[in-house]
Swiss-Prot record:
Catalytic activity: (2R,3S)-3-isopropylmalate = (2S)-2-isopropylmalate
Transmembrane segments: none
Cofactor(s), by name: [4Fe-4S] cluster
One of the Pfam families matching this protein, by short name: Aconitase
GO biological process, one term: L-leucine biosynthetic process
Organism: Streptomyces coelicolor (strain ATCC BAA-471 / A3(2) / M145)
UniProt entry keywords in alphabetical sequence: 4Fe-4S, Amino-acid biosynthesis, Branched-chain amino acid biosynthesis, Iron, Iron-sulfur, Leucine biosynthesis, Lyase, Metal-binding
Binding locations of [4Fe-4S] cluster: C347, C407, C410
Subunit structure, as described in the record: Heterodimer of LeuC and LeuD.
Note on how the cofactor is bound: Binds 1 [4Fe-4S] cluster per subunit.
Classification lineage: Bacteria, Bacillati, Actinomycetota, Actinomycetes, Kitasatosporales
UniProt xrefs under CDD domains: IPMI
GO MF terms, alphabetically ordered: 3-isopropylmalate dehydratase activity; 4 iron, 4 sulfur cluster binding; metal ion binding
Protein name per Swiss-Prot or TrEMBL: 3-isopropylmalate dehydratase large subunit
Length: 476
């Protein structure tokens, strides 16, 4: 019988297999940040162990980093301590670190791919659930806990139970104005936040194949929001073109050999998945969340659902609780929901294509009165590229705040937070209660919807904008 993409990569990395025990996998790339690594390094110190493979380990600062005044001391003592601890640990153990202010600093899941560290057929781990992002390259990538971080640092291996596989096939072409973020939000709403539990998801089909690498990263990034262990997309010419010439990509004959191997990383025709889901791309539309988990979403053209419409008691209760927290009413049109803040950034949508898309919509327009718009590049390198294209000027002229790289408002661990009761349209990946700050209310959206929302002041898509939203040039 043939094998799926996930099975091929898994089998290639098994160091030891024994009946009744988890497989022991070799890890090709270990990414670190300041939040989940301190106890792991402490464990190494206590046991007197070094980092096993410094050449396969890299760290960056992202979760706690400020996005303003990065040359000044960090005010919050916890954030400052975590960053200082990471710097000391990396110095003590010889781990490569890209700290705040470094040209390669940024959100770990943006930094890895842009450096060419993430490659097809590799295993990638990080103490962060959105490590699934790297599966866009045909890598087997998953988040791990702190004790597992220590295990990988010490041994470059990890014992893991083999997950099941699920194919998510997206047939046809995405309609105009529908993005990768809309697609993954629709998938999560379809299968639920627990629908992928115990599975590695493989995204397939015409719509997936036509996505750029950055769009594919958005898809795989949110696999964890469907409960999955990982998400993967088979590598192809789009993948190879993205990787070629990047700092850590193979060169010359090594490149040719790598591409030949990468081309084998496709699910065999006779392979069998444990589960399959089919999505019709033509039926999709701009999508937003209305509740407090990523599965509570609907097309922007819809209304807030009535909890009474849910047959399942637990779903009904969750919807009731979500509406109470979000301050919404059943039947309320999603487009009528006013926002206070718009956030463009994160490891989901903080790449250059995302910033270009948002900038194109706010160009020659103004952010609505009473709305605050934060634009945060996913890495310092992305920020430099955006500046070279003049995108920072576009955002600032529209009235948005242009920031330095970091996780920013994706989570309430740095100064960029919502105040209690404030509502945001956010391109990040989670909308749990308090995720963006205590009492904050989050609607997950695409960069395009975020930008249109910033201009109109309520949830909106670019199609809702008209020529009337463009200021008349002086003297005309």
């Amino acid at each position: 019988m043939g094998r799926t993409l996930a099975e091929k990569v898994w089998d290639d990395h098994v160091v030891r297999r024994a009946e009744g025990e988890p497989d022991l996998l070799f890890i090709d790339l270990h990414l670190l940040h300041e939040v989940t690594s301190p106890q792991a390094f402490d464990g190494l110190r206590k046991s007197g162990r070094p980092v096993r493979r410094l050449d396969l380990t890299i760290a960056t600062e992202d979760h706690n980093t400020p996005t303003l005044d990065i040359d000044k001391p960090i005010a919050d003592p916890v954030s400052r301590a975590q960053l200082e601890t990471l710097r000391k640990n990396c110095a003590d153990f010889g781990v490569r670190l890209h700290p705040l202010g470094d040209v390669e600093q940024g959100v770990v899941h943006v930094v890895g791919p842009q450096l060419g560290l993430t490659q097809p057929g590799t295993t990638v781990v990080c103490g962060d659930s959105h490590t699934s992002t790297h599966g866009a390259f045909g890598a087997l990538a998953f988040g791990i806990g702190t004790s597992q971080v220590e295990h990988v640092l010490a041994t470059q291996t990890l014992p893991l139970a083999r997950p099941k596989t699920m194919a998510i096939t997206v047939d046809g072409e995405l309609p105009e104005g529908v993005t990768a973020k809309d697609l993954i939000l629709a998938i999560i709403a379809r299968i639920g936040t627990g629908g992928g539990q115990g599975y590695i998801l493989e995204y397939r089909g015409e719509a997936i194949e036509k996505l750029s690498m950055e769009a594919r990263m958005t898809i795989c990034n949110m696999s964890i929001e469907a409960g999955a262990r990982a998400g993967m997309i088979a590598p192809d010419e789009t993948t190879f073109a993205y990787l070629q010439g990047r700092p850590h990509a193979p060169e010359g004959a090594d490149w040719d050999a790598a591409v030949e191997y990468w081309k084998t990383l496709r699910t065999d025709d006779d392979a069998e998945f444990d589960a399959e889901v089919v999505i019709e791309a033509a039926e999709l539309a701009p999508f937003v969340t209305w509740g407090t988990n990523p599965g509570q979403g609907a097309p922007l053209s819809a209304a807030v659902p009535d909890p009474a419409s849910y047959e399942d008691a637990s779903e009904r209760f969750a919807a009731e609780k979500a509406l109470e927290y979000m301050g919404l009413e059943a039947g309320q049109p999603l487009r009528s929901i006013q926002v206070d803040t718009v956030f463009v950034g994160s490891c989901t949508n903080g790449r250059i294509e995302d910033l270009r898309a948002a900038a194109e919509i706010v160009r020659d327009r103004k952010v609505a009165d009473g709305v605050r718009m934060l634009v945060v590049p996913g890495s310092a390198r992305v920020g430099l590229q955006a500046v070279s294209e003049g995108l920072d000027v576009v955002f600032k002229e529209a009235g948005a705040e242009w920031r330095h790289a970091g996780c920013s408002m994706c989570l309430g661990m740095n100064p960029d937070q919502l105040a209690p009761g404030e509502r945001s349209a956010s391109t990040s990946n989670r909308n749990f209660e308090g995720r963006q700050g205590k009492g904050g209310r989050t609607h997950l959206v695409s960069p395009q919807v975020a930008a249109a929302t910033a201009v109109l002041g309520h949830l909106a898509s670019p199609a809702d904008l008209s020529a009337a939203d463009v200021p008349t040039p002086a003297g005309v």
